Amino acid sequence: MSFSKWGGKPSNSSEKQKASSTPTVEEINRGVGDIGLNSEQNEGWEVYARKPKNKGGSSAGKQWAPQNPSPKAWGNQNTKAWGHPDVGKKSGTRNNAGSGRGSGNNWSTPSDPQKLARPHLYDGGFPSSAPVPPALKNGWDWSSRVASAHPKDNSQVAAAADDDKASEHDAEDNELDFLDESDDDLHSDDFDSDVGEMSYETRKKNPWFNQLFHSLDSLTVTEINEPERQWHCPACKGGPGAIEWFTGLQSLMTHAKTKGLRVKIHRELAELLEEDLRQRGTSVVPPGEVYGRWGGMEFKDKEIVWPPMVIIMNTRLDKDENDKWIGMGNQELLEYFSSYAAVKARHSYGPQGHRGMSLLIFEASAVGYIEADRLSEHFSENGRNRDAWERRSARFYPGGKRLLYGYMADKKDIDNFNQHSAGKSKLKFEMRSYKEAVWNPAKQMREDNQQLIWFKNKAAKHQMQAKALEESLSLVSEKHRQTLEENKIVRLKTKMHHEQIKEEMEFQEQFFKDQIKIIHDARTAREDNFEKTQQEQREMVKQSNANTASVEDHRVRAEKVAKFIKLQDKEMEEFVEERENLMRTHDDRIAALRRKYWEEEVELERKFDLELSKLMEKYSPKQSDEVNSSGTM
C-alpha cells in the first residue's frame, strides 16, 4: 500500500515490500480482462468490512471533500430496468455497476440488470475497505492514467495505483456519508422540496424521477398494471433500499406512501404516480385483482308482445260438410293448459275456416309473462318449439292424435294471426320493452317479496313478543292480584293488632289511672287526718286552759296555749311550704317523665317510618324489574 495516501514518505523497506507485493498496471489490466459478467461470482454479494483509515495519526495530508447527492451515482442504467417484468428475480441483485479498472476502454453499466455483480479485483493482497461504490460517469479513465505512468518505474506505478485506490476508498466513504436518510440531505439542486408552484411536467423531469417516468412513457397501461412487473424506488436511490424490488406498481405506491425515511421525496413520488396514472385514465390495480382479462356481459333489452301470448299450432281437427276446417275451441284450449293460468284463448280463422293457429293470452304482468315463458319452455323441452314446427316435424302421435306445438308470440306471429281479421275482430296488442314490462316489475316484485318476507318475519317476531308480553302481563297481573289480596290481609291483621294493642294500652292506662287515683285518695285521707289531728290537739290545749282555778294559773296557762298555738302555726307554715315544694318537685318529675315518654314515642315513630320505607324500597323495585323484564321478552 502506498504511503502517499497518508501524506508521509515511504522508506526503503516499504518500497521493496511494495515492489514485491503490489501488482503493476499491466497485471491489473490482465486481471480485469479475465473478469466475466456471467461468472459464478455474480450469484451473490461479498461482504467487506470498512478498514479504518486513521492509522498512527498520519492522516493529516489527506482531507475529505463533501459530495453532493446526484442521480448519476446510479450509473448509466438501462431504462427498461424500471419496468421490465423479468428484471431482478433474485433479491440479491443490484442495479449499481461493478467498479473496476480497464487498460484502454471505460466501463459502463450493463444493460441486463440480472448480470450486475461486483467483480473480484486483485488489490495487492489488501482487503477492500468499503462496499461497492456506484459507477463513475465516465469510468475510471485508465488510458490517461496508464499513459502518464509509463515514464515512471514500477514502484512509482504501484504508488500511483495505491493513490488511485485510496481515492477510490475516499469516494466510497464520501458516498456512504451521503446515505443519510433524513430529508435535510435532499435540499439540493437535484430535489426541490418546494414543489407547490411547479407544474406536473416540471416535477416529472426531476432527476430523481425522470428515468422512472421515461420508462412509464414507453409502456402501455396494461403493461404498467401487470402484477408481476418489478420496480425500483427512485426515492431510495443511493440508499439501502435502492436494490429492493417491488412487485407490482401497487407495492411501489404503498412503499412511497408509507416510507418513514426521505418522507418528502417519497410522498412526492406517490403524488406524481397517482397523477400520471390518472392522466392515463387508469389507477393502481390492487393485489389479487386481474386486470383487463375478461369483460362482463351487458343486459340487452328487447321488444316483446304485450300482453304476453303463446302461439299454439296444429289446433285444427277436420273439415266440416262445407269443406272448411274446424278445430279446437276456446274453452277446450284453456282446459288443455289449465296449469299455466292463461286468461283467455283465441283462434285464427281464414277463408278455409280454422287455420290451426291459436293463441293463449296471459295476464299483462310480469307474472303472466313468466307463465307464458314457462309454457314456451315446456314445449321447447319436449322438442315442439318454433324451430320444430318450421322444420315440418311430425304432426300426429302414433294412433292419429295431433301434436301441439307452441312458442312465444312475436310481432310477425300476431300480424299473421290477424291476417284475415278486420275491424274489431283483430287481436289488439302492443310492443313493449322487456326491461320495462317484465324485468323491472319482476325485480321490484323480488325486492317487494324480500321486503314482504322481512315484514313477515318482523310481524312474526312482533307477534311472538306480543304473545310473550301478554303472558308476562297475565303473570304480572295475577301476581299483582295476589299481592293486593295479601296486602289486604296484612292490613286487616295489622288493624286488628292495632285495635288489640290500643285496647290493651287503654286498659293499662285505666289501670294505672285507678292506681294513681287510689294513691291520691289515700294521700288526701292522710292529709285530712293530719289536719284533723292538729285541730284536735289545739282544742285539747284550749280545753286544758279553761279548767284552771286561779287567775295566775289561768294567765300562765293562757301564755302556754298562745305559745303552743304560735309554734303550731309556725310549724304548719313550714309544713305548707315544704308540701308545696314537694308537690312542685313531683310535678316536675311527672313532666320530665311525660316528656321522656313523648320523646321515646316520637323516636319509635321515626324508627317505624324508616323501617317502613326500607320495606317499601325492598319490594317496589322488584315488581318494576319484573314488569320491565317481562316487557322485553
From Swiss-Prot:
Keyword line: Antiviral protein, Coiled coil, Cytoplasm, RNA-mediated gene silencing
Miscellaneous section: Does not move between plant cells.
Annotated organism of origin: Solanum lycopersicum
Record's compositionally biased regions (Acidic residues): 170-193
InterPro entries in alphabetical order: SGS3 (IPR044287), XS_domain (IPR005380), XS_domain_sf (IPR038588), Znf-XS_domain (IPR005381)
UniProt similarity note: Belongs to the SGS3 family.
Region (Disordered): 1-133, 147-193
Keyword Cytoplasm: yes
Chain intervals with Low complexity compositional bias: 93-109
The protein, known as: Protein SUPPRESSOR OF GENE SILENCING 3
Residues forming coiled coils: 565-606
GO terms under biological process: defense response to virus; regulation of defense response to virus; regulatory ncRNA-mediated gene silencing
Bias-annotated ranges (Polar residues): 10-24, 56-67
Role: Required for post-transcriptional gene silencing and natural virus resistance.
Main location class: cytoplasm
Gene3D superfamilies: XS domain
